[in-house]
């Protein structure tokens, strides 16, 4: 997670963590997604818990990016985001 935070902060590609993030997920990778969404104009509490607000923000990002808006951060959404 530290590597991911460093690379995201410095505009470098962050590799997909290998697991989809969805409602109920938690941890540093969720926090990283929340921080990225906030940098794109969302106003999430970056607490590392993937709840309804994070899912809605992910769906908005997916729609803007031409992806299926399912609220899940899978590999395709991750690659567009990072």
Where do the PLM segments sit?
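Acidic, Ser/Thr/Pro/Gly-enriched interdomain connector segments
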Residues: 2-48
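Conserved hydrophobic/aromatic packing and binding residues within compact polymer-binding modules
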Residues: 37, 58-61
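PDZ domains, with a preference for the canonical peptide-binding region formed by the helix
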Residues: 75-81
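Conserved micro-motifs of the catalytic ATP-binding
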Residues: 65
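DNA major-groove recognition helix of helix-turn-helix
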Residues: 62, 73
């Amino acid at each position: 997670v530290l590597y991911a935070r460093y690379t995201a902060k410095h505009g470098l590609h962050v590799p997909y963590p290998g697991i989809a993030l969805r409602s109920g997920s938690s941890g540093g990778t969720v926090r990283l997604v929340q921080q990225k969404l906030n940098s794109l104009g969302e106003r999430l509490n970056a607490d590392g818990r993937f709840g309804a607000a994070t899912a809605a923000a992910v769906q908005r990002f997916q729609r803007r990016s031409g992806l299926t808006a399912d609220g899940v951060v899978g590999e395709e959404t991750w690659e567009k985001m990072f």
